[in-house]
């Protein structure tokens, strides 16, 4: 029986949908992808007067997964509504609570493009899990009154929010053999919400529900220093709160050498729960809209293509296909396929075509 997956696509660079087409051709006896395209961010604001239309939200909630390009740019800096808020509405509508950002070298040769010395970064392999629904970004906010004298933001977390993302981390840790160690980052020496509450709930949840998982706690400032000088000490799962995760995951992008190499997933449930192996999620490359190079055909599509691999693994329960995509990307890089951001001359389209060609080679070799 052929499975049908509805996937909502908010366009960015098109490496992702192209790879999906090739996956469908390889698994045509097993799967069909129905791609529905919608606008998000500035493009949606120009067309509909809102960063995301209600129809797009409805389709996204009904879909198996969402594939997302980059949002925003200087053309909308003076828009009456921040166009980036469309992504926030999408995450809230889908209850996306756990952001996964793997930080590693898809091929060892890329250690030479890292911002860190090769002997420092070689072997780095982290999965940063960032809580998305709580913390200072969602707490009560008091803007200054125009005099620039005072303003405030409330950092607020509830037990259930921390517990849910800790369970996500524990579940993913237990999916490997041996279980992947977890390092939880906080500021427990000074702060209440993303400090002592966070540490206490994570400690209780992992020790009680995932006793075989090695857990350690680290202050966020210590983690930032460690990431810059000995990143392999953080190998495994790195679990942290919304704001700390926002900052530390961007810092971690210096390890592989380009934001364009990194994928991400924002999951709406814990894999292996009531939904079995499939969970709804939003998949997007880490890089922004890159307005300075947009339209030149030189954006690195690796992050988008690897985001498709994450979608295949977490939302579509196609782990073999996910591994095939990752292997194809690694093989293209090994053969010299590199975009400008990592020292090459390969265009966006050429890189995507080469990945598709490698996928076909893998099929023919079977």
From Swiss-Prot:
Q: What EC class does the entry list?
A: oxidoreductase
Q: Which cofactor does this sequence's record say it needs?
A: Mg(2+); Mn(2+)
Which Gene Ontology CC terms are recorded? cytosol
- What's a single GO BP term from this record? L-leucine biosynthetic process
Q: In which residues is NADP(+) bound? A: 71-73, 277-282
Per UniProt, Mg(2+) binds at 221, 246, 250
Q: Which UniProt keywords apply?
A: Amino-acid biosynthesis, Branched-chain amino acid biosynthesis, Leucine biosynthesis, Magnesium, Manganese, Metal-binding, NAD, NADP, Oxidoreductase
- Biotech utility: Due to their effectiveness as antifungal agents, echinocandin derivatives can be used for the treatment of human invasive candidiasis.
Q: What residues does the record give for site: Critical for catalysis?
A: 137, 187
Gene3D superfamilies, alphabetically? Isopropylmalate Dehydrogenase
- Kindly list the GO molecular function terms attached to this UniProt entry: 3-isopropylmalate dehydrogenase activity; magnesium ion binding; NAD binding
Keyword Manganese tagged: yes
Cofactor mode of binding and number, as noted: Binds 1 Mg(2+) or Mn(2+) ion per subunit.
Q: Which residues bind substrate per the record?
A: 91, 130
Pathway(s) where this gene product acts: Antifungal biosynthesis
Report the domain of life of the source organism: Eukaryota
Q: Fetch the NCBIfam families from UniProt.
A: leuB
Q: Which family does it belong to?
A: Belongs to the isocitrate and isopropylmalate dehydrogenases family.
Assembly, per entry: Homodimer.
Q: What is this protein called?
A: Isopropyl malate dehydrogenase htyC
The record lists the organism as Aspergillus rugulosus
Q: What is the lineage of its organism?
A: Eukaryota, Fungi, Dikarya, Ascomycota, Pezizomycotina
């Amino acid at each position: 029986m052929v499975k049908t997956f509805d996937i909502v696509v908010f366009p960015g660079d098109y490496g992702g949908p192209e790879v999906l087409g090739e996956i469908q051709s390889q698994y045509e006896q097993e799967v069909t992808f129905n791609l529905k395209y919608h606008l998000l961010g500035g493009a949606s604001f120009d067309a509909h007067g809102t960063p995301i239309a209600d129809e797009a939200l409805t389709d996204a909630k009904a879909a198996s997964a969402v594939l997302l390009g980059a949002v925003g740019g200087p053309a909308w800096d003076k828009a009456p509504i921040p166009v980036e808020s469309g992504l926030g509405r999408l995450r809230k509508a889908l209850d996306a609570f756990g952001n996964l950002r793997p930080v590693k070298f898809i091929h060892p040769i890329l250690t030479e493009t890292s911002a860190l010395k090769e002997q420092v970064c070689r072997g780095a392999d982290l999965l940063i899990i960032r809580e998305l629904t709580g913390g200072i970004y969602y707490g009560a906010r008091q803007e200054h009154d125009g005099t620039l004298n005072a303003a405030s933001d409330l950092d607020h977390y509830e037990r259930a929010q921390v517990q849910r993302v800790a369970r996500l981390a524990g579940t993913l840790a237990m999916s490997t053999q041996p279980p992947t160690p977890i390092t939880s980052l906080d500021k427990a020496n000074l702060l209440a919400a993303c400090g002592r509450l966070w540490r206490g709930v994570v400690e209780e949840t992992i020790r009680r529900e995932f006793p075989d998982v090695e857990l350690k706690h680290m202050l966020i400032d210590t983690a930032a220093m460690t990431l810059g000088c000995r990143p392999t000490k953080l190998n495994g799962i790195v679990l942290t709160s919304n704001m700390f995760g926002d900052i530390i995951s961007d810092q971690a992008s210096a390890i592989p050498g380009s934001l364009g190499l990194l994928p991400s997933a924002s999951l709406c449930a814990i894999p292996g729960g009531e939904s079995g192996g499939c969970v709804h999620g939003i998949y997007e490359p880490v890089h922004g809209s890159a307005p300075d190079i947009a339209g030149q055909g030189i954006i690195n599509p690796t992050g988008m293509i690897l985001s498709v691999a994450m979608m295949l693994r977490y939302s579509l329960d196609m782990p073999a296909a996910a591994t095939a995509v990752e292997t194809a990307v690694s093989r293209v890089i090994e053969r010299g396929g590199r975009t400008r951001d990592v020292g090459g001359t390969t265009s966006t389209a050429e890189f995507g075509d080469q990945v598709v060609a490698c996928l076909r080679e893998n099929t023919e070799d079977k």
